[in-house]
Amino acid sequence: MKPEDLFFDTSGLDKDHAQRLTEEALTGSDDGELFMEHTLSESFSFDNNRLRAANFDTSRGFGLRAVNDETAGYAHSTDMSETAIKRAASALTPVISGHSGTVSDAPAKTDTSLYTDTNPLEGEGFADKVKILEDILSL
């Protein structure tokens, strides 16, 4: 699966349309970006060494950031749609217009790669994961 398939398969958007919306939203700003995120999570709950609950969740969304002089604004949504991106762009209008609020120091920049493209949730089957956790609990 290509990364763009994670965001554009059901959103009614494609990569080029999202890029055009982002360019329109950031017109007049010094810098900015559209950040998209897709998250998979899995959890297991044991009680008295017995599996009591197992959960799996998938979520996705985006953040739109605009920088103008020393002011940055950020808007986000879990709805990956044209309407949501336009709504986020509207929330950034004061920053792009030169108005400011609370200023935060930028985080320290790093170029350290923290993650690989390997999905650990696909590595082992459900039964194998439960067995590993049961073995750990029996120690």
Each model region followed by its residue ranges:
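Active-site bordering "gate/hinge" segments
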Residues: 1-139
